Swiss-Prot record:
It catalyses: Endonucleolytic cleavage to 5'-phosphomononucleotide and 5'-phosphooligonucleotide end-products. Disulfide bonds join 30-34, 222-264. Its cofactor is Mg(2+). This is Nuclease. Pfam families: Endonuclease_NS.
Length: 266
């Protein structure tokens, strides 16, 4: 049987699509189950992160990512783009942030951090606006940035091979609107982050943090430690959904010891 060029091209495309699907199926940015519950709409799996988009707020309900010794990188550009995997009506575009910094003193804040993950193959997706929220400059450049730095430094330890994080916004009061868009959207009033190391939080090496949008720039991130229970109650999500119920209950009601490895004092 002879194959013409069109048939060969089609076969190549089908093979590439299947290979891509197989690769995505092997990605696990959560390790012990991604969050469940809440107002979930669309989930997207990438090497850089897994996120759950909310078409009402226009921002992710949560973003999960996995830092290894190979994922950090520097010198990457910040080229903001609309997420091509989403309906444009369900997310924001770069122009929607016009005037936001001057009017609201907000930055385009990464949920999955660029510096920690720029070494992955699809690093450019870190600059998709599905992974971005309007985060107050004082928070983004202050306590949040210092927490991200300490999170990334964990991977430098010989006894740590992986850092798993899930992060997201809270909407508990009105924070105004972006002046550059007519799209309906909701600016977060707070942000949370849950971190554990290696393969499971079950050995007590985990941490949970919650920051108000108006956190002062000089604030110590260690002062914003909370339990996973508190984050679940305020978000409506179930974190670490793949763990047995009794293990979840035991861990989530108390703070973990991971902050001690991140420079926090008891």
């Amino acid at each position: 049987m002879r194959f013409n060029n069109k048939m060969l091209a089609l076969a190549a495309l089908l093979f590439a699509a299947q290979a891509s699907a197989d690769t995505l199926e092997s990605i696990d940015n959560c390790a012990v189950g991604c969050p469940t519950g809440g107002s979930s709409n669309v989930s997207i799996v990438r090497h850089a992160y897994t996120l759950n988009n909310n078409s009402t707020t226009k921002f992710a309900n949560w973003v999960a990512y996995h830092i290894t010794k190979d994922t950090p990188a520097s010198g990457k550009t910040r080229n903001w783009k609309t997420d091509p995997a989403l309906n444009p009506a369900d997310t924001l575009a770069p122009a929607d942030y016009t005037g936001a910094n001057a009017a609201l003193k907000v930055d385009r804040g990464h949920q999955a951090p660029l510096a920690s993950l720029a070494g992955v193959s699809d690093w450019e997706s870190l600059n998709y606006l599905s992974n971005i929220t309007p985060q107050k400059s004082d928070l983004n450049q202050g306590a949040w940035a210092r927490l991200e730095d300490q999170e990334r430094k964990l991977i430098d330890r010989a006894d740590i091979s992986s850092v798993y994080t899930v992060t997201g916004p809270l909407y508990e009061r009105d924070m105004g609107k972006l002046p550059g868009t007519q799209k309906a959207h909701t600016i977060p009033s707070a942000y949370w982050k849950v971190i554990f190391i290696n393969n499971s939080p079950a050995v007590n090496h985990y941490a949970a943090f919650l920051f108000d949008q108006n956190t002062p720039k000089g604030a110590d991130f260690c002062q914003f430690r909370v339990t996973v229970d508190e984050i679940e109650k305020r978000t409506g999500l179930i974190i670490w959904a793949g763990l047995p119920d009794d293990v979840q209950a035991s861990l989530k009601s108390k703070p973990g010891v991971l902050p001690e490895l991140m420079g926090c004092k008891n």
